[in-house]
Swiss-Prot record:
The gene is thiE. Binds 1 Mg(2+) ion per subunit. It comes from the Bacteria. It is an enzyme of class 2 (transferase). This is Thiamine-phosphate synthase. It comes from Bacillus cereus (strain 03BB102).
Length: 219
């Protein structure tokens, strides 16, 4: 197996759904199915925060979600936990600046997908040099889902990455909704990552479809 190509990675980032059990008011397995039916291109398992599952329960839940992603042929990424990603033979892992270092993550993950959250050009360059396949840039807009977020960057912050010669695939993160998706893509992102825009939507299927339409219209 060889590392994913830039072109392929860029396409996969289009509509990036991130979810854990505590992000849903409905059955999370149903929410994921609806999102997959609606057209998400990649999924990240992020079981964190208040009311999150732990231990064996967390592993079993991750396996259920992974099995559903496999049915649809959509990559299953694990947030932060490299050991869990390896145990599940996930398609990849996404790490933040405070998690395990990118060099060690790349070494352990081999040719699997490695995504890194970055907030500055320096962090972005370091991640690229050490094997990141894509960057998560944000928060673009204020978000209530993550409590430990950095300062809001706005679409200008995202555009700055492109102006500084960062050409690696980028997914916009933070406070993204159907209404502001176009501005994120126009600023230079290859795709948008969302939690509540899908997980808390009245119809996760309809919401995903609209996000997919917005992204394709803006690319």
């Amino acid at each position: 197996m060889s590392r994913i190509s830039k072109e392929e990675m860029s396409k996969l980032l289009s509509v990036y759904f991130i979810m854990g059990s505590n992000n849903c008011t409905k059955d999370p397995l149903q929410v994921l199915r609806e999102a997959l039916e609606g057209g998400i291109t990649i999924f990240q398992f992020r079981e964190k925060g208040e009311g999150a599952l732990t231990g064996e329960e967390r592993i079993c839940f991750a396996k259920e979600l992974q099995a559903i992603c496999k049915e649809y042929g959509v990559p299953f990424i694990v947030n932060d936990d490299v050991e869990l990603a390896l145990e599940l033979d996930a398609d990849g892992v996404h790490v933040g600046q405070d998690d395990e270092g990118i060099t060690s993550v790349r070494e352990k993950m081999g040719d699997k997908i490695v995504g890194v959250s970055t907030h500055t050009i320096e962090e972005a360059r370091w991640a690229i040099e050490n094997g990141a396949d894509y960057l998560g840039v944000g928060p673009i807009f204020p978000t209530s889902t993550k409590k430990d977020t950095k300062a809001v960057q706005g679409t200008k912050g995202l555009a700055h990455f492109r102006e500084q010669g960062i050409t690696i695939p980028i997914v916009g993160i933070g406070g993204i909704s159907i209404e502001n998706t176009a501005s994120v893509i126009e600023a230079g992102a290859d795709g948008v990552s969302v939690i509540s825009a899908i997980s808390l939507a009245e119809s996760s299927y309809e919401s995903t479809k609209k996000l997919v339409e917005e992204v394709s219209r803006s690319l």
